[in-house]
From Swiss-Prot:
HAMAP family: G6P_isomerase. Belongs to the GPI family. Pathway: Carbohydrate degradation; glycolysis; D-glyceraldehyde 3-phosphate and glycerone phosphate from D-glucose: step 2/4. It is found in: Cytoplasm. This is Glucose-6-phosphate isomerase, cytosolic 1A. Homodimer.
Amino acid sequence: MASPALISETEAWKDLKAHLEGIKMTHLRELMGDTERCQSMMVEFDNIFLDYSRQQASPDTISKLYKLADAAHLKQKIDRMYNGDHINTTENRSVLHVALRAPRNSAICSDGKNVVPDVWNVLDKIKDFSDSVRNGSWIGATGKELKDVIAVGIGGSFLGPLFVHTALQTDPEASKNARGRELRFLANVDPIDVARNISGLNPETTLVVVVSKTFTTAETMLNARTLREWISSALGPSAVAKHMVAVSTNLPLVEKFGIDPNNAFAFWDWVGGRYSVCSAVGVLPLSLQYGFAVVEKFLQGAHSIDQHFSSAPFEKNIPVLLGLLSVWNVSFLGYPARAILPYSQALEKLAPHIQQVSMESNGKGVSIDGLPLPFESGEIDFGEPGTNGQHSFYQLIHQGRVIPCDFIGVVKSQQPVYLKGEVVNNHDELMSNFFAQPDALAYGKTPEELKKENVSEHLIPHKTFTGNRPSISILLPTLDAYRIGQLLAIYEHRVAVQGFVWGINSFDQWGVELGKSLATQVRKQLHGSRVKGEPVEEGFNFSTKTLLTRYLQATSDVPADPSTLLPNI
């Protein structure tokens, strides 16, 4: 008998649907009172502790989710990914970001070829180059050392490396290695982003890393040309060869741009942009800032989770458990969003990165076979570090919409502070909130409890907390390069699990194409209006035509053929 075309047609899915009503009638106060249940919902791997006991789920729910995973052939799909099968069917590609952090002696194949030697050839090249820049043997056009790096990219070429960079900035080992150096990221085509990036920098001491697989990405290449002009106008056109390098596979365009092809660092079609932080996309700028040895520890951390994900049984597999629980929350309980709440300021860029990884991967409306999905998939990801978020959007999380939360805590602070006379130290104060918030969400506060506290009758409705709001807690022992790599890989694989169960392609992103193609028409119109004085053509709808006309009229002072003007800040 053939497998159902959609996961929602399986008996396992229908069984969970039938199970749902009983769970909805059971409050987390009751579920949390079952110690045996709570113990069964705690998992540890390599000193990473996951507690999912505050999920609206019973042991029976979890058992049924394992059956759903079996019905979705989850294990086989994970194996196919690791085996290099073309699981990205719409682009006919392997999905092998796990190969980017595999040990040198590993064998991971795509189209019958072991790709690990190619990965390590690039890593070795990055190590040699970053060492030469850091030790001063590679110098700029005027003989000065290159202490500042601007990485130019967008999307996955920006968000992932920025997350890791921000997390490493306050790690003692990494910050020591980065002393006297600066790493910045230029992503937005808005000239303000250019101005902010070059502010205070000297072209003589700046190295630019241009990240574009095809070397045709519109925003990235415009920003790259802008920085090329910034360098050339200060140091002369020949300086580009010493002050700009590329992460790309299109060597002819790299050379045409003015960058020596020998200073181009490759990555491959089997690396998706949002999964590329462990490739030259992230490893090159991060190695220039922190040294290759630190970045190698980051890769080793990611690899440890890759091994765990591929080999651990589902009941002890952290990414699998997190992925299945997300499917439960989204497709069955109907919660459309997820809050990522790291109680570590060093992780302030985690949520924006996972927002892309998750929403670009699983923001799909059809199955991998092109069938419309009759259920909700994907979720809206957002977040902010604690305790800042508590003074921002936690009001809604506690008393408004139900939003499942990921609480991420770190046992040992990167930068501990102890003040004499304080009741607790700064990190203990932070962690007091980390431990309290999940219980506040789960238990809430009843009108009866408020009456016992002699709260005024008219305030009781306003001070009541319904509770029964699900969360998970992840406790990391430290936050160093290794643990940052582990955290990244946990979320990457969690997203893949969700897509595998929903039966969608988590590794393409056709949704970004339509807006880009329409922008081409607008770009052509702006050029025609600026240079030739052409009116806005009839090809636009009334609204867009009105907005475009208004914009052009208000910027009529923009010269048709301007001389070069760079930001002055």
